[in-house]
Amino acid sequence: METENAIYVHLKGPDEFGHDGDAIGKMKNIEEIDERFFGTLLKNIDTNKVAVMISADHSTPCINKGHSDDPVPVLISGDRIENDGSKRFTEEFAKKGEIGLLEGAQVVDKAIEIIKLGN
């Protein structure tokens, strides 16, 4: 990726709401991150030149109030990256996404592959 640029964002905030079992709080936190952080970020980068990857280190479903082995949502976005049709950024939709199920150590390599294919 010598000529590629990418930004990786690790989401931690929603995890706390998962531990509290607060699904509404978790959803609102993700919406706030989307509006305040990503809204600002996307206004200030050239998405034709920069890809953005969003993920976390584990799933924390509200129903469990703890960490689980559910898939962790991963979003990779940029003008040159094709949408896989996923409509929501959730553990459930992560199971159905085009990226598939990966081990944690495979995520960055898969992201680089997807970004390069977008060229």
Identify the meaning behind each predicted range:
Residues 1-119:
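Feature captures the catalytic ectodomains and active-site-proximal regions of enzymes
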